[in-house]
Each structure stands twice: as structure tokens, then as C-alpha cells.
Swiss-Prot record:
Species of the source: Xenopus laevis (African clawed frog)
Gene3D superfamilies reported in the protein's UniProt record: 6.10.250.1710, ESAT-6-like (1.10.287.1060)
Topology relative to the membrane: Peripheral membrane protein
Predominant location category: cytoplasm
Similarity annotation: Belongs to the SNF7 family.
UniProt-recorded name of the protein: Charged multivesicular body protein 5
Subunit structure: Probable peripherally associated component of the endosomal sorting required for transport complex III (ESCRT-III).
Alphabetic keyword roster: Coiled coil, Cytoplasm, Endosome, Membrane, Protein transport, Transport
Coiled-coil residues: 22-153
GO cellular component term, pick one: endosome membrane
Subcellular locations according to the entry: Cytoplasm, Cytosol; Endosome membrane
Amino acid sequence: MNRIFGKSKPKVPPPTLTDCITNVDGRAESIEKKISRLDAELIKYKDQMKKMREGPSKNMVKQKALRVLKQKRMYEQQRDNLNQQSFNMEQANYTIQTLKDTKTTVDAMKVGAKEMKKAYKQVKIDQIEDLQDQLEDMMENANEIQEALSRSYGTPEIDEDDLEAELDALGDELLLDDDTSYLDEAASAPAIPEGVPNDSKNKDGVLVDEFGLPQIPAT
């Protein structure tokens, strides 16, 4: 059948805005290069005219410069038009992409809302309240157990008057213990003599014994 009717050609996808922008930008860059070459020619003609005298030759160079300048103006107009087209397509492309992003965001929010509804269905408020009540009861039971364990047994009753009397007596005993008069007596006792008994010195300051002879130092 393909031999008789021929095989259909695959459909070529239409160009996107991005493709069109790339194409237009490429054309604008090509025109910009042409403008740069014309600028170089204009500079060359201008330098020639500065060195030439007035006359037919200078007029001929001037006419060439005017033609080049005219071409430059045309190219500049084309470049500006292409740049404007590229800008418009970029704005349209930006708007389209923004709408796509918005749709994606809305779809994600819808999915999130569905998931939240499912999660809320699995959570029972009554079960949470029952759980809170159970926890509160267990805490009360734990407190009662602690109070029971800390209960004291066989503790005699103590008279407050007896405690105050004992406290007053304890204060007197502490005052007696704080008496430091014995320290004063120890401080007034005669000092311990220093040096060796019966030591004396002659007029030259040499230590002598009881017979007045110089002492031999011990080695």
C-alpha cells in the first residue's frame, strides 16, 4: 500500500516562540556586523577627506561616504525592528511560561488539599480526647504511687515547745564553744628563747663559751 499511495511524511512540529526568538536574534546580530563594517568604511572615507583638498576627487569620496551612511541607516532601522520583534516575542513567551507555572502551582495545591483531606479523615478527634484523658489518669495514678512510697511510718509526735527549748540551749552551748580566752592566755606566755643557752659574744662579735674562748663551729 505504501508503494501505491506513498508513505506519508512525518509531521514537522511548528516552531516555538523560543525558536523564533533565536532566529530573529541571529538576524539582528548579522545586521550588527554589517553596521560595524560600514562604520569602518565611514572612518576611512572621513580620514581621506581630511587629507584632500576641495575638488572633484574629494566630492567623489564624499558621495561614497554618503552612500555608505545611507546603507548604515537602513541596516540600523532593520536591526531596531528585529530587536523590537524579539522583545515582543520574549514578553509573550514570558507570559506563557508564567501561566504554565501558575497552572502547575494550582495543580500542586489541589493535590495537597486532597492529601490533607485524607489525612484529616484518618485523625479522630474523639480518639485524641480519649487518649488525653487516659494520659491524665495515668499521671494521677503515678502521683498517688509516689505519695504512697514517700509515706513515713512510726514517726513520734514532737512537741514544738520542746524543740524551741532545745534550740535555745543549743545556742548557749555554741556560745561556750566560741570562748577564745584561752587563746589570749597562750599569746601572753613568755616567748621561747632562741639560740643556744649561755651563748655570748666578745667585742669583735665572735661567739665564745662560758670560759670566754671562741667557739668552734660544728661541722
